[in-house]
């Protein structure tokens, strides 16, 4: 038996990073109760999404994340050829996702964000602190992808133009400030305060929602929806967070307000997945490369 176990190959570095990315997406989807988002209770403000579809979509993205990490290891330079390679792989991953979901956009924003971060992590696996990985991802995001086919403006791009807000592209080019300054610090604070992991992750999501100019919310509900999201998320945290009785009441009020406006904070959900991915990279710090 021991000889058999010894022959089982360790997952490669690229496989580990792809596993972490898909795991972050699945854990984000499973987290409950998220205000107006798909979770274990139901579909939130969505009519075309459910938890089963979110799981299937996340698993369908594993080959794309794996290929991005492999590209980073083989090309080994943070330059335009790598940027264009992962852009192509991301588009292929999106096509696979849409085939699995029947055309429903479940994780387009997450492909962009986590694709950059998987690539950035694989480029320098000895330097996996969240700030280091996010800065490398930002440098990648700023590079032009000359192979990007012409497309009509997305919902997010139209929202950016209408309201003059930052979108997913700007968030990445800035090094994911919503995660580095808000999501990750709140996750750690809530853990340090004794919260269980579910409540710590909910608090991290709320910290992101409290400051993010979420283009998904703006698309569905305009500035009224954005104010509802930001003010409501802040109210939960001020009340003591999702683990407190007052915080749970405020969380319920937030959800009811968002549902009334048909607003779903999908951008914040993507950044929570980023938060969970970066958080899981830290235990890999200092580990021998062969052990990853």
Curated annotation (Swiss-Prot):
The record ties this protein, via Gene3D superfamilies, to: Triphosphoribosyl-dephospho-CoA protein (1.10.4200.10)
Q: Does the keyword Nucleotide-binding apply?
A: yes
Top-level lineage group: Bacteria
Enzyme Commission identifier(s): 2.4.2.52
Query: Which UniProt keywords are given for this protein, alphabetically ordered?
Result: ATP-binding, Nucleotide-binding, Transferase
The catalysed reaction is: 3'-dephospho-CoA + ATP = 2'-(5''-triphospho-alpha-D-ribosyl)-3'-dephospho-CoA + adenine
Query: Does the entry feature the keyword Cell division, yes or no?
Result: no
Q: Which GO terms label this protein's molecular function in UniProt?
A: ATP binding; triphosphoribosyl-dephospho-CoA synthase activity
Biological processes, Gene Ontology terms: prosthetic group biosynthetic process
Function of this protein?
Involved in the formation of 2-(5''-phosphoribosyl)-3'-dephosphocoenzyme-A, the prosthetic group of the acyl-carrier protein of the malonate decarboxylase.
Q: What does the similarity note say?
A: Belongs to the CitG/MdcB family.
Question: What is the protein's given name?
Answer: Probable 2-(5''-triphosphoribosyl)-3'-dephosphocoenzyme-A synthase
């Amino acid at each position: 038996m021991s000889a058999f176990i010894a022959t089982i190959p360790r997952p490669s570095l690229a496989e580990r990073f792809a596993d972490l990315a898909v795991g972050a997406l699945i854990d984000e989807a499973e987290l409950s109760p998220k205000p107006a988002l798909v979770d274990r209770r139901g579909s939130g403000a969505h009519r075309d999404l459910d938890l089963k579809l979110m799981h299937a979509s996340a698993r369908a993205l594993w080959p794309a994340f794996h290929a991005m990490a492999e590209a980073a290891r083989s090309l080994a330079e943070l330059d335009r050829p790598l940027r264009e390679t992962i852009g192509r792989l991301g588009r292929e991953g999106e096509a696979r996702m849409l085939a699995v979901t029947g055309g429903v956009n479940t994780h387009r924003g997450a492909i962009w964000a986590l694709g950059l971060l998987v690539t950035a992590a694989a480029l320098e696996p000895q330097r996996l602190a969240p700030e280091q990985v996010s800065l490398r991802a930002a440098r990648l995001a700023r590079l032009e992808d000359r192979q990007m086919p012409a497309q009509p403006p997305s919902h997010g791009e139209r929202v950016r133009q209408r309201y003059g807000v930052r979108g997913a592209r700007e968030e990445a080019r800035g090094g994911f400030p919503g995660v580095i300054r808000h999501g990750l610090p709140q996750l750690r604070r809530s853990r340090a305060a004794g919260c269980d992991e579910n409540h710590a992750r909910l608090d991290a999501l709320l910290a992101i929602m409290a400051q993010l100019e979420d283009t998904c919310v703006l698309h569905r509900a305009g500035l009224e929806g954005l104010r509802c999201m930001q003010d409501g998320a802040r109210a939960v945290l001020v009340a003591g967070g999702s683990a407190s009785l007052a915080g749970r009441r405020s969380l319920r009020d937030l959800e009811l307000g968002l549902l009334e406006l048909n607003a779903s904070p999908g951008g914040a959900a993507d950044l929570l997945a980023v938060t969970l991915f970066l958080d899981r990279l830290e235990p890999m710090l200092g580990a021998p490369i062969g052990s990853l």
